[in-house]
């Protein structure tokens, strides 16, 4: 992959991340608390913190990526599948960063 191709990959990923958050915020968050669903998830999860809940949700995507990697190079996933799984993992890492920073702010 050339530098120019990688820059294009980055821009597409950033755009997709913003698009995903715009859509999902209406479903899982409020203007007052973007992490509301993770805080409510504490009651449904085996974890006792919103960060633990987010990590649990993220692990599903990490496991999927691990499976994709284990099948390479013989079986290469579609771009659509790869972009979805990598994007979901990135999104959960951003959420985890925000949750941890929010805890430090309180």
Region locations from a protein language model:
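Intrinsically disordered, low-complexity regulatory regions
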Residues: 1-106
């Amino acid at each position: 992959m050339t530098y120019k191709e990688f820059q294009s990959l980055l821009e597409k990923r950033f755009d997709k991340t913003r698009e995903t958050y715009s859509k999902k915020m209406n479903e899982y968050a409020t203007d007052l608390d973007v992490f509301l669903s993770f805080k409510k998830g504490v009651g449904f999860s085996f974890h006792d913190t919103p960060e633990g809940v987010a990590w649990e949700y993220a692990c599903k995507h990490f496991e999927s990526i691990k499976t994709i990697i284990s099948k390479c190079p013989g079986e290469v996933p579609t771009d659509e599948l790869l972009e979805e799984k990598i994007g979901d993992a990135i999104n959960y890492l951003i959420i985890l960063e925000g949750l941890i920073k929010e805890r430090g702010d309180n």
